[in-house]
């Protein structure tokens, strides 16, 4: 489910994000509350992987220091799922000691990182700080989900259909199972 920060909304509208994602775009921490539920917790729990792209220096600092003052910073703090960040910022911001320490802390906490790349930046400069290409981010997401799980290499036999148990040579007990679930 996409979450758009106030800064991100300066570049693209929530409506555009919703249209591209075919999902509701969330922008406000408190607009999620329905029937007394904690919306940010719901978002954090119903995901399999939290992907933050682009991850600004501000958001990285909030994540590294446990600051949760908006939906984008609260969700990764509230999740127990893996987090993947794709940093994007000015070269000087990327190379700043504070940013490097924040990224090191996040990586030590198990946050995965892709990028940033070297290349053209928004301020007509070139250098490290460019967000990884969307195709590379997608490849990292696919790699995450294609990791072998606890059942990798195991084989299973699935049987389906009715169960018939003989009582004697003439009578039996059976159920009306069609087997459709087993064939699905």
Regions found by a protein language model. Name each.
Residues 1-83, 91-179, 183:
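A cross-family phosphate/adenosyl-ligand binding-site feature
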Residues 88:
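G-domain G4 guanine-recognition motif of GTPases
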């Amino acid at each position: 489910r996409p979450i758009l920060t106030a800064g991100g909304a300066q570049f693209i509208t929530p409506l555009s994000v919703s249209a591209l994602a075919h999902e509701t775009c969330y922008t406000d921490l408190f607009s999620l509350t329905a029937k007394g539920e904690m919306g940010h917790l719901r978002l954090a729990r119903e995901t399999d992987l939290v992907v933050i792209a682009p991850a600004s220096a501000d958001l990285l600092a909030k994540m590294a220091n446990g600051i949760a003052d908006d939906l984008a910073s609260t969700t990764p703090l509230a999740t127990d799922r893996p987090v993947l960040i794709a940093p994007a910022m000015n070269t000087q911001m990327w190379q700043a000691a504070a940013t490097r320490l924040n990224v090191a802390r996040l990586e030590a906490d198990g946050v995965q990182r892709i990028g940033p790349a070297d290349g053209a930046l928004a301020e007509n400069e070139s250098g490290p700080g460019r967000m990884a290409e969307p195709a590379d981010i997608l490849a990292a997401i696919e790699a995450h989900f294609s990791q072998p799980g606890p059942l990798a290499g195991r084989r299973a036999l699935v049987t389906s259909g009715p169960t018939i148990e003989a009582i004697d040579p003439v009578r039996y007990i059976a159920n009306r199972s069609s087997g459709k679930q087993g064939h699905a």
